[in-house]
Structure formats: C-alpha cells, structure tokens
Amino acid sequence: MAKQSAIEQDGSIIEALSNAMFRVELENGHIVIAHISGKMRMHYIKLLPGDKVKLEMSPYDLSKARITYRY
C-alpha cells in the first residue's frame, strides 16, 4: 500500500506553546497543534502569534500538523 500524501492547509498562529509547538487556527476555523519542521529550525526562522503559515497534516490525525512555511 502506498503512503497517503500530506494535506496542505494555510492558517495563522494563535499561541506559542512550549517546545517549539504552536496553536494554529486553520482557514476553515479548526484549531490544531503544530510543530516547526526541521529546515525551519535549522535556519532559525522565528514564528510569532499572528503569523500566516503553511501546514502539512497527516490524513490519519487531523489534530496535529507540521509548519513548513511562513508567509
């Protein structure tokens, strides 16, 4: 069986949590917990509440996501 592809969504950061985790509100109104991708950590990209971001979500767990891009 092939691996399911990630779902890409846009959202905005509501709150910064501990351990580089963020509470993010998606464009459709849902709220998810997201962490920063490895490349963003390597390049020290800072995120603040109010920033618009692109997220990748697994089709198996839609309550968690990975932040892959900051607009």
From Swiss-Prot:
One of its GO terms (cellular component) is cytosol. It is found in: Cytoplasm. Disulfide bonds: none annotated. The keyword RNA-binding applies. Residues 1-71 form the S1-like domain. Its main location: cytoplasm. Pfam families: eIF-1a. Keywords: Cytoplasm, Initiation factor, Protein biosynthesis, RNA-binding, rRNA-binding. One of the essential components for the initiation of protein synthesis. Stabilizes the binding of IF-2 and IF-3 on the 30S subunit to which N-formylmethionyl-tRNA(fMet) subsequently binds. Helps modulate mRNA selection, yielding the 30S pre-initiation complex (PIC). Upon addition of the 50S ribosomal subunit IF-1, IF-2 and IF-3 are released leaving the mature 70S translation initiation complex. Belongs to the IF-1 family. Component of the 30S ribosomal translation pre-initiation complex which assembles on the 30S ribosome in the order IF-2 and IF-3, IF-1 and N-formylmethionyl-tRNA(fMet); mRNA recruitment can occur at any time during PIC assembly. This is Translation initiation factor IF-1.
